[in-house]
Amino acid sequence: LSFPALPFFTAGLRPELFAGAGTQSAHRVLLVTALSVLVLAGFAFRANGLSSEGLSDDELNKLSAVNEYRTQGLTSANGEHPLLMKALLTVSVIAAEKWNQTSLVAGHPELNVPVETSLRFPVALFGAFAAVLIYLVAAELFGLETGLIAAALWAFDPLAIGFNRIAKEDTFLIFFFLLANFFWLRGQRVAESQPERNPERFYWATAAAFGAMLASKYVPMLIAITVSYNYAFQRIPVTRWVIGKKRFLKFFFVMGVVFLICNPTILLPGTWKAMSNFTSYRNMAHDSYEFMGGLYPHRFQDWFRGEPWYFYFALIATKLPVLSLFSFGLGLGLLFRRKSGDGRYFLLLWFSLWALSFMIPGGKFTRYLTSVLPAILITAAIGVQFAARRLGRLCARVFENESLKVYARAALASLVIISAFWSAARAAPHYRLYMSVLGGGHAKAGAYFPQDEFYDAYMQDVMIEIAKRARPDARVAGELPSLASYYAQRANRPDLACVEFSDPQELEKLVPGDFLIDARGRTYLNNQVMLARLRQVSQPVLTISVGSVPAAYVYVLDQTSLAALRGELQNRER
């Protein structure tokens, strides 16, 4: 962390804020070693205990798509999402199955790779390597020290780790976005400071990375961040970083070709039908989202009637380690100082355009923060570096020893990084349940964003316990019938009929001795009254926890609880 920063050139300003860092390059071996340690340590956090939590309903949809690809070839399965991630998941699942069939695993069953692990492994891998891309982007904008601090914060941040341990598209989205912008910013550097070189190869590499990004998740607005950053320099007379219309046309052509190569299922009619159903909410199973104890409509067009605009502010305030949060606040203020250099415009555009796209719509999920979390951590790294330099100068002045500067700077940066490491270590392996002291600590785990914090992690254990107790052909009611059925099959109880209890027809079919799952985060506007009535007249026979946090309550239904669910008790009282 005491490495001097790289020289920095953009179309305008040099970041005077960190000018004291010097312009020598760090020893390449030391730099590669530092990044390798961060990637390996970050991967260890992300990959350890991947099967400690059961699959979510979303992840089961991915597994179903993988199985369909294997039996039928490329289809429109899970077609509302692009192919690239599902293709990587398919490779991982097949590789794990081949591994599990080896004689080595036969003799050592503990080496067997569960499907939960194989499905999530590619996400964990890409999430760990994203630390390198964060370093590269931050180093281009603000220098080597900021890049290393930002990479370390990503490697050990509980939020980042939690998002990188679920089989969803957001990690791949941000990976390719970062890759694209590293090429884009390197092209800027070449255009401005090395006129003898042609920067075009960096533009085409950017376009290719964006094609892969869109083949990971359909979030084209992120491209606007990159293009807007270039546009911000076009009115500067001396700028050399000019793309031009012809090159932009070629840029989007390259992006489109790579997109089609990585996502050929976009050409299937069934894919467009699935996307239409998704965007029109015809496949939307649930009508709301629980946030801080309240239920909110959850559609995109609910706008300010949906989840509150401060949803992501609450997430950052309660889930970032305290020192990382304070560093982010300091760094955010520094982004409005001219001395921070032109790189600050990239982060400001990132924050602004992301906020317009994700904070105003009514439908929000915590994992959407993944696409702006690197910007938050880079900003935090700016704050750490600024404070560390101030501390270094203070120590040198107080003790009249210039050599103390380096040690003081390294000590403060290390303190912030170690605090993130410690937070992640304490939260393992249930990182999504991490709560900072400002959020109320572990006592408040699962209280603010229960659907995303638990993410159905309890369902495997729930069905194992029900399978032990249920009579033949019993019905199991809950809000996740497909997932319950999957784990019932895994528990050798294919006879169990798993149904959605908020469906009036299925509710009428329940009889005494059937089971009902009341899971945290799965209370909705259409079932909250029924669950409230059930809780008043009955007690769960089982409580399933994720770690030490109660996550789901299992009821064995009797005549009284069935009458409460159906509202018959209230009708009698009237």
Locate each region found by the language model.
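Transmembrane-helix signature of polytopic, membrane-embedded enzymes
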Residues: 101-110, 134-156, 175, 194-197, ...
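Aromatic/acidic, Gly/Pro-rich catalytic loop(s) in extracytoplasmic/lumenal soluble domains
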Residues: 497-574
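Short acidic/glycine- and proline-prone juxtamembrane loop motifs at membrane-interface regions
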Residues: 56-57, 159, 165-172
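Transmembrane-lumen/periplasm boundary regions of multi-pass, lipid-linked membrane glycan transferases
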Residues: 45, 65-67, 81, 87-88, ...
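Transmembrane-helix motifs of polytopic, lipid-linked glycan transferases
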Residues: 113, 117, 121-141, 179, ...
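Membrane-interface transmembrane helices that cradle and orient dolichyl/undecaprenyl
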Residues: 139-141, 145, 180-203, 213, ...
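Short helix- or helix-capping micro-motifs
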Residues: 39-42, 150-155, 162, 182, ...
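Specific aromatic-rich, kink-prone transmembrane helix
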Residues: 133, 172-192, 205, 209-210, ...
